[in-house]
Amino acid sequence: MNKISRYSRRRFVQYGSLVLGSSILAACAGGSETATEATESPTASSSPETAGELTPVTFGTNWFAQAEHGGFYQAVATGIYEEHGLDVTIQMGGPQVNGTQLLMGEAVDFFMGYSADAINAIQESIPKVTVAAIFQKDPQVLIAHPNQGIQDLADLKGHPIFISKAANVTYWPFLEAKYGFTEDMKRNYNFNPGPFLQDKDSAQQGYLSSEPLAIRKEGGFEPVVFLLADNGYNPYSTTIEARREMVEENPDLVQRFVDASIKGWYSYFENPAPANELIKEDNPEMTDEQLAYGIEKIQEYGLAISDEAETDGIGAMTDERWQSFFETMADAGVFEEDVDYTQAYTLDFVNKGEEYYRE
């Protein structure tokens, strides 16, 4: 990848077109072609060769720029990545982005993933590895109308629920297994709250830090919100994924990116202004109100700092947590029981303690 100019700190979302080889498309079947700029992966040199030289790195996100990505933007905006010898370009995602294709096609060096996809990749013999988990709790929520007698998730049984296609291989099988949800409840979610607002009997999916506010503003009411992570659905979220080849051959680069990203998150919670400016530049539809709401909910519900992350630092992961999630989802029929889920992650780059990341 060519050296990214100093201007990249302010212009770090790139668009273009990516055409992946047939072998990658076959390995990562189920995705679609994604707008991006093809780049080479920095695998030959893990550290700057001379003083002041930075290693170019591209990080792909899973959605449009928002508070849930704030720590990564903060590490760019405040120079934390540069302090770790990295010149980071953040490549914004969207609803049609297939992160596995981008990662395995070497269009990005790291990608923002989640536990279910990481284990599914191992099931499909795709060599990618989760190296950190920024969110201990998945922000996925189900949202219902007030005054409909819906007090908990079990009360949604029998109601129409607007969900995305991705839900069919993530949280929906869990809801079927634990709460008795059925196929006939599903409605197609097009990332627009309109259908939900028109049907008081319905519910819809969303992100804790986004859709509830949008519904409150558009619908004029406070929705009932259920965080799935507080109701038995326990994957890691907003993870950092890398190709196994990079993890094995260039661990120093992986460590520097993970450390800098985590430090960016601590910085973001202290003063989000630098990152928020960049987020708004790259996603003009994002507002100060939405960003403030997002940060508030991330902290209120302990998405990033809870469980092991309270002592081991943001990004923390444990073998026990991965095992618990795998067994829950295997019981729900999402994963084959003989999958070696331990190949989906490594603890080598995290769990260094909060003080380490605040230095």
Describe the function of each predicted region:
Residues 1-27:
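N-terminal secretory signal peptides
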Residues 29-38:
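Bacterial lipoprotein signal-peptidase II cleavage site
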Residues 37-53:
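Post-signal peptide N-terminal segment of mature Sec-exported envelope proteins
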Residues 48-189, 193-198, 202-209, 226:
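Short, glycine-/small- and polar/acidic-enriched structural segments
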Residues 80-84, 179-181, 218-220, 285-288, ...:
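Short helix-capping segments at alpha-helix termini
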Residues 116, 191-195, 199-287:
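Pocket-lining segment of extracytoplasmic ligand-binding domains
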Residues 249-334:
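Secondary-structure end/capping motifs
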Residues 320-359:
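Conserved C-terminal helix/tail region of periplasmic/extracytoplasmic solute-binding proteins
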